[in-house]
Design a protein with these regions (language model features):
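A glycine- and Lys/Arg-enriched "phosphate-lid" helix/loop adjacent to the NTP-binding pocket
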Residues: 101-172
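Conserved substrate/cofactor phosphate-moiety recognition/catalytic segment
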Residues: 37-76
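Hydrophobic anchor at the beta1->P-loop junction of P-loop NTPases
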Residues: 20
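Conserved lysine of the Walker
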Residues: 28
């Protein structure tokens, strides 16, 4: 299955742009695929298989952090714009707004030079001027420990060096991100320690989307 998948069907969200956000390995791609199938939307996935920096980044993070983040920003901007230009509803596995979380954590851990980080932030802000926002972001709320467990279970060689400390820092940064982004984009927080039924999640998204509420916590 490629980065994009179109399925048939109609729903109250047929023209909605839904972003699925969360830590590494929590199940974003699986939920994005299921939601797309259920709601009759197009699914867009993270550019993992053809990421030319992925292996190098995990092998020598400090050396490749800037190149990796710029590569991902470029690819995700392209995907984001394709969704907008298509004029159709879509579910996106990780939004472009989350990229800045990873860049800031890399800087804080001394794995990205402050000069490179400032260049990255400037580039991100310039691109942001041309972006229409998603209609809603679904945040899959998972502990760093559960994220680490799921990463181990899927056994991707390139992810073998991901530490629990890195995930803890990411989780803290995500919490700040969710508060900030909810000021401009409706956010639905879904407890995801245990996988939930797609239909139940879709119903919650539909209800919250039509209400246009911000920073809602969905308990399933």
């Amino acid at each position: 299955m490629g980065e994009n998948q179109r399925v048939g069907g109609t729903s109250p969200l047929c023209n909605a742009f839904i972003g699925v956000a969360g830590l590494i390995g929590v199940g974003k791609s699986t939920l994005a695929r299921s939601l797309a199938d259920h709601l009759g939307l197009e699914a867009h996935y993270e550019p993992v298989a053809d990421n030319v920096y992925l292996d190098d980044f995990y092998a020598d993070t400090g050396r490749y952090s800037f190149a990796m983040q710029v590569y991902l920003l470029n690819r995700r901007f392209q995907q984001h714009q394709e969704i907008i230009w298509s004029g159709r509803g879509a579910v996106q596995d990780r939004t472009i707004y989350e990229d800045s979380i990873f860049a800031s954590v890399l800087r804080d851990m001394g794995l990205m030079h402050p000069r490179d980080y400032e260049t990255y932030v400037s580039l991100f802000q310039n691109l942001s001027n041309f972006m229409c926002r998603p209609n809603v972001i679904v945040y899959l709320d998972v502990s760093p420990e559960k994220s680490f467990e799921r990463i181990q279970q899927r056994s991707r060689t390139c992810e073998s060096g991901i530490s629990l400390e890195y995930l803890r820092r990411l989780r803290d940064a995500y919490e700040d991100f969710v508060v900030d982004i909810s000021r401009i984009i409706p956010v639905i927080r879904v407890g995801w320690e245990q996988f939930q039924d797609t239909e139940t999640v879709a119903d919650a998204i539909t209800e919250e989307y039509t209400r246009a509420n911000f920073m809602r916590t969905v308990t399933l």
